[in-house]
């Protein structure tokens, strides 16, 4: 079976793609699978949070991980999108971003071996900031490259298969942690180093794609952020709702902190949390997506409420002295990640349905810039409060999430025109 036939079978194509597309498709699946596996092995919400806590880093560094990763991947996108237009072959931005992520991940692994305490926190957070910026470059460039190398009816198969393969790998990693075969934090450092190697390999493989040259353009100006916000009240309210729901992304490290503070911080507990997170994604994403097609605002409202309930449940377990039990963190995290995926699905659906067709890219870039800024501010709030108590920071996030869910009910129902 040649490359074209194999890719046709994988993608379910009715017609066999040409040789170039078949080769590109297989290489994109392999490269994306490696990067998505890396994402799971280095997950800041769980893996890096656990590692920093095990290294004795102050809580402020642990709680800074998600804001650094998420905001760092959002804020530069407008600038990088402008730069992308000046490149004839846009695969190089993705390949370069993947290589830089790999080097940053290896830096995190080295820091985990060499440092402890606040020095480990500082070094790992700095390396994660570099990784986040590189991730932004990959995010901006991938759709451009895929649009030129894979036919429209086969693109979803590429990303879908890569996600499925990565999910299996992360579940296997979680199972190893649960099994007790891996006994110390060195196993987590090795996993982070493996993520770095996979990113390097993915970048090298992606650079071999056969990409048609694009017409080089002058870098366009940045979208008028203030004007865009001023002219559309629906966009302003949507950004406010999405901003109030950022605790769904920020809260997992606090659950890790409370679990380890009240328990023994065993690797098996980390494995259980990774498994719970993977199951939440697998079981809820499709359902949330279908519900968002009916009413994205109701999904945002429900997800905000679910997130608040999950955080309150963790606080109740913590104050009852049960947060360190082997089941508490994973069960609460499952509920929280179900809510997170609801927000993730509904925010995209609502923005696409709300925005005028000709302004969708502009609305998305403005929303991402605003949310990146809000993530940083929320992260600073959480970090400041966590120096006093991670529990009180989580309580604050529960209130904010509930407010976001309530405000979502006031959004216009865009799915019905």
Predicted regions, residues:
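Short hydrophobic/alpha-helical segments at membrane-entry points of transmembrane helices
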Residues: 28, 119-128, 237-238, 324-333
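Substrate-agnostic recognition of the 12-TM MFS/MFS-like secondary transporter fold
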Residues: 28-46, 65-81, 97-101, 127-184, ...
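Cytoplasmic membrane-interface "Motif A"-like loop-to-helix N-cap segments
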Residues: 85-100, 293-307
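C-terminal ends and interior cores of transmembrane alpha-helices
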Residues: 99-117, 306-323
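Helix-loop junctions on the cytosolic side of multi-pass membrane transporters
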Residues: 203-219, 409-417
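Helix-to-coil boundary motifs at intracellular loop junctions of multi-pass secondary transporters
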Residues: 54-55, 86-87, 145-149, 258-263, ...
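C-terminal transmembrane helical hairpin of 12-TM major facilitator-type secondary transporters
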Residues: 298-343
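Helix-loop boundary and gating motifs at the non-cytosolic
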Residues: 2-75, 234-273
């Amino acid at each position: 079976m040649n490359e074209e036939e194999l890719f046709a079978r994988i993608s379910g194509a009715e017609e066999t793609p040409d040789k170039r597309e078949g080769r590109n498709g297989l290489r994109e699946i392999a490269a994306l699978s490696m990067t998505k596996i890396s994402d799971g092995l280095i997950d800041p919400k769980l893996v890096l949070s656990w590692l920093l806590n095990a290294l004795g880093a102050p809580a402020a560094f642990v709680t800074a991980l998600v804001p650094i990763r998420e905001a760092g991947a959002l804020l530069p996108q407008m600038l990088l999108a402008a730069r992308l237009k000046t490149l004839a072959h846009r695969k190089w931005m993705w390949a370069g971003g993947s290589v830089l992520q790999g080097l940053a991940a290896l830096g995190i692994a080295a820091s985990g071996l060499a440092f402890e305490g606040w020095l480990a926190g500082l070094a790992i957070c700095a390396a994660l900031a570099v990784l986040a910026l590189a991730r932004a470059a990959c995010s901006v460039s991938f759709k451009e490259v895929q649009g030129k190398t894979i036919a429209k009816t086969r693109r979803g198969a590429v990303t879908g298969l890569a996600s499925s393969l990565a999910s299996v790998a992360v579940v296997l990693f979680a199972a190893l942690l649960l099994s007790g075969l891996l006994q110390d934090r060195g196993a987590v450092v090795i996993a982070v180093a493996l993520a770095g190697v996979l990113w390097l390999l993915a970048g090298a493989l992606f650079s071999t794609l056969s990409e048609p040259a694009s017409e080089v353009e002058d870098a366009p100006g940045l979208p008028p952020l203030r004007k865009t916000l001023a002219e559309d009240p629906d966009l302003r309210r949507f950004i406010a709702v999405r901003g109030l729901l950022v605790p769904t992304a920020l809260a997992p490290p606090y659950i890790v902190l409370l679990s380890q503070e009240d328990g023994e911080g065993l690797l098996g507990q980390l494995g259980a949390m990774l498994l719970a997170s993977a199951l939440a994604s697998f079981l809820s994403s499709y359902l949330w997506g279908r519900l968002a097609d009916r009413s994205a605002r109701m999904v945002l409202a429900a997800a905000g409420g679910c997130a608040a309930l999950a955080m309150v449940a963790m606080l109740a377990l913590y104050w009852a002295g049960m947060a360190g039990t082997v089941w508490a963190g994973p069960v609460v995290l499952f509920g929280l990640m179900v809510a997170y995926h609801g927000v993730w699905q509904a925010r995209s659906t609502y923005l696409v349905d709300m925005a005028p067709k000709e302004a969708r890219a502009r609305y998305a870039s403005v929303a991402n810039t605003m949310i990146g800024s809000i993530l940083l501010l929320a992260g600073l709030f959480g970090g400041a409060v966590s120096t006093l108590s991670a529990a009180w920071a989580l309580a604050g996030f529960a209130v904010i999430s509930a407010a976001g869910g309530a405000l979502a009910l006031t959004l216009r129902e865009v799915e019905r025109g």
